[in-house]
Amino acid sequence: MSGRAVSNPQHAQQSFDSGPQLYRDVPELHAVPSPSHSALMDSTHFDDFAFAYHGLPDQSSLVSLADHTHTSQSPTAFPQHQAMSGLAHSGLPFGTLPTGNRSQSMEGSELPPPDRTSPASNALEDPTTDEFGLASRNRADGTDLGGKHKEDKVDATPAWSELKTKAGKERKRLPLACMACRRKKIRCSGEKPACKHCLRSRILCVYKVTTRKAAPRTGYIAMLDKPLKRMEERIIKVIPKSDQEVASSVTRAVVKPVIPGTVPSSKPTKKRGAEEVFGPDLDAWAKAPSKPKIEGDDRPSCLQVQEAEENMLQHEGAEALPSKEIQEHLAEVFFDNIYGQSYHLLHKPSYMRKLKNGTLPPVLVLTVCAVAARFTSNPLVSSSGPELLRGEEWASHAQDICTRRYEWPNLTILTCLLILGLHEFGTCQSGRSWALGGHAIRMAFALQLHKDLEYDPSGRHSTKTQLSFIDREIRRRIMWACFLMDRFNSSGTDRPMFIREDTIQIPLPVKEKYFQFDLPAPTEMLDGQVPHPVSPNDGQIADARENMGVAAFLIRAIALWGRIITYLSQGGKDLDPNPMWEDESHYVKHLNDVVNLEASLPLSLKYSAENLEVHKTENTASQFLFMHICLQHNILFVSRAAMSARKQRGVHDDFFSEASKRTFDAANRISELLREAEQLRCFVSAPFAGYCAFSSTTVHILGIISRNPSMKLAAQANLTTNVKYLHKMKKYWGMFHWMVENVHTQYRNALDAMRAGANVQERATQSSFLQYGDWFNCYPHGLSDAEFMDPATLKRKDSGADGVLEAKSELQSVEEYFSTLPTPRSAENKDTIRAAAPKRKQSAKKQTGMPAQPGQHLDSLQSTDADAVSQERKFSGGLGLQTTGAADFNPLAASNPQNPAFSTTMPPTSPANMTAFAHHAYTPTFFPPELLAMNFGQGSNGNIDPLDRQLVYGGYSMDASTGLGDGQDMTSGLDWDTVASGAQPDGGLQGRRSNVKAGMHGQSAGMADGAGLSGLEASSAWFMPFNMEPPDIGQDPGFNMGGIDPFAGVFGGGGSGLATPNALGGLQQQGP
């Protein structure tokens, strides 16, 4: 056996000599083989081989320790050199190394064992040599070439094979390999606590258990996705948090490319594809607008984007704005004449500051300029047209902008709607004003202005913006302005109110100085409750009533007036189970509320000269006067309603007498307040103040015909004040033309009743109050183009307006046919309307003949008046309204006398007869225009009323204490309801109005009572100025004395050839 092992010792020595350079420096390896070398090859060490051993042909490869490419390396780099040198002198078998060095080398290093192909590895010391068998086994069994040992086929079944998979199937693969086998990439047997390999290698067997799944191999698409993900993370850090909420809802896709060469499984799976899951959402996201959602807005994104794209409110309408100087001037006019009287809108310091900075929306500036232009005297703003139409061009632009944004509520548009409604109210456009008011109310509720909110409701819940005191007060005042507009516009008989008092849960406005200087203070609600009471230690004024100013009590006064209107005109009186004179009736409750409201005013708001001066210094005197006028008007309105109950059974005399006293006291008080305002030059410009003056005037008309001399004198003086105020208001608010006409009608009815002396109490009917909102029915479409005094002609109904109604018959009766034919008068009016402006300046033809019939005379006067008045009228163009012009009447223009006999009796110096001397161009300047407007008719006995003695020459010729010729007192036999409702008394009038139809101008009562028609004696009185003393004569011997109607000149009296006032258009020539 030994001889076979060493049969060719030369060949063995040559193979060792051809080894690597690693062992060249070891002399023992190159010497003659020692006995230990022969012992190393002894067959006893290979007893496991089953066949004879003939020697290895390539034995040098077994003992080769390094590759030829690494022969240049230093031997010191290999610590195995000492091991091999010791191996030559030891008696250990081939392949056996000391265990001490092996364990020390394996345990002293944490690095993995070197690979056997590495140049630093030693095949003799590689622990993997045990993988092919134990040390007692021979190498000739083929395991060195990768073959399996015989025992592998008969090895027991591994323990892990008994485990099942999650699906319950038999496991074919090892679930987990140890760390050593994983590093060497060999198959692990999986035994625990140590696998076979680790037992052979005598190393520690460790199984690393982890829950993290292995990451997939990074592909090309994933490699491109990494920088995109990093860039996305950077962008997310820059995006605001509010927008991250939207971005977080979109899941970022993770793209996994398909492995090339693989075929997708045809088996149906439970998981859906990416297209099926994310396809619709991705399409919607791709087609959505690119702009993000507006912050602080919960409306649908489509509306937000649409509004954002055409967000022109900040600069839309800028081309129609006037100059900066006019804007600031009209803003001051607005806060001096409109603010606080109609509505408490806008915060003046904020508005003026934004106006100077140019940050106000043009639509708001246009609206303010439109409503304020009527009150300015600036020549850059005023035009040849009437005052109330000066701002119509600006209003039309503002209204177009507002109507295009009706579905987007905001405070700016809402404020513009309220102011535009007031402007259209003044131009007699009732349809527009009514519609704008309703639109504003709906928008206010949409903005939740009826709730006292601390945060802006338009913001999102996550970004609530707390409102400041000024902003909360502005919201409250806008809502109260909507409430007032609803009460004003719904005061008519057929116009119910929309806003209920219990729906407004906000406090009343604070004092004006608190609002201007940003001083928070608690106030009461409309029902008297305090929503947010404070203690005196909070730094605020604790008394809520003291914190309320003029605006708060004005709102309470108008709210009470609305309840009175509901009771008297909208069915509340019929629902009252008790008669009004009973203590349990609703009427008595309203009466007590009216009286208690005035008594509940704080000391700073009670009327006195001192408080009026204080408010004048604060520039709120007009508001202070307007509030007290409204309080007195409530007393007048509710007290006068009791006059209709005096005919009923069971009424107490005290009830009627107290109501009568309260009515006259309130009417006189209103006139005193108007006179006080005129003396202080505090113009009360609120339209409702004009209605209060109108109601007071109707009471003064009844006082003039009273048998009480003191009441009569007071009524005459107060009537003069009221009528003068109404004529002044007529320039700014068009509906006062209608009110003046109604006052004229009532006054003529009172004079007719006084002259007739007939008892009309038996013919009295239920009184019909003229409501503040009734002008809507009188002026549905503004004023007429030609006269500017008549309501606009009713347009023919559109044929499509009755499309949903029943089909009517197309046949006409004879009466209906003739009613459609135009009358000669209407034809003349049409010719007058169609006449051009140059033709209107031609002089009217004189007519000296007496008409045969009174009716014919009236028609001729009306046609002549239209030509005469047209000479002085100029029409405004380009304003965009139906009423393109108005009468600018010159009160110094005189007419030709229609009665030559009467004209010769007038003094040649009388200004009323100046046209008789047309060649004289001089007109006395000491006659005020108001006096030239007076026209005196005749009474029953030729006496002059005491009030007019200071006005007329010859007015002191007779004693006025005789009163009427028969000494009859006119209060008896005269029903208040008859006069107020316009009922005509019969008897004593001799049918003078039987041939005259009632018209809008009021000439039906004008000419029938004049001296030129009735044949009575003409008056010798002529005007004297207020600032001149009456002549010191007792009687004029040259002229006949005639009775004078004291207010015929004011309301269109008899036809004496003087200038008489027209009911709506001002004064009008009464001559041929």
From Swiss-Prot:
Compartments where found: Nucleus
A Gene Ontology BP annotation from the UniProt entry: DNA-templated transcription
Gene Ontology molecular function: DNA binding; DNA-binding transcription factor activity, RNA polymerase II-specific; zinc ion binding
GO cellular component, one term: nucleus
Keyword Transcription regulation applies: yes
Disulfide bridge map: none
Miscellaneous note of the record: Multiple copies of the gene are present in highly virulent fusarium oxysporum strains.
Described function: Zn(2)-C6 fungal-type transcription factor that has a role in the establishment of the fungus within the plant and/or the progress of the disease. Regulates the expression of virulence factors such as SIX1 and SIX6.
PANTHER family: ZN(II)2CYS6 TRANSCRIPTION FACTOR (EUROFUNG) (PTHR47338:SF27), ZN(II)2CYS6 TRANSCRIPTION FACTOR (EUROFUNG)-RELATED (PTHR47338)
Protein name stated in the entry: Zn(2)-C6 fungal-type transcription factor FTF1a
Highest classification ranks of the organism: Eukaryota, Fungi, Dikarya, Ascomycota, Pezizomycotina
Protein encoded by which gene: FTF1a
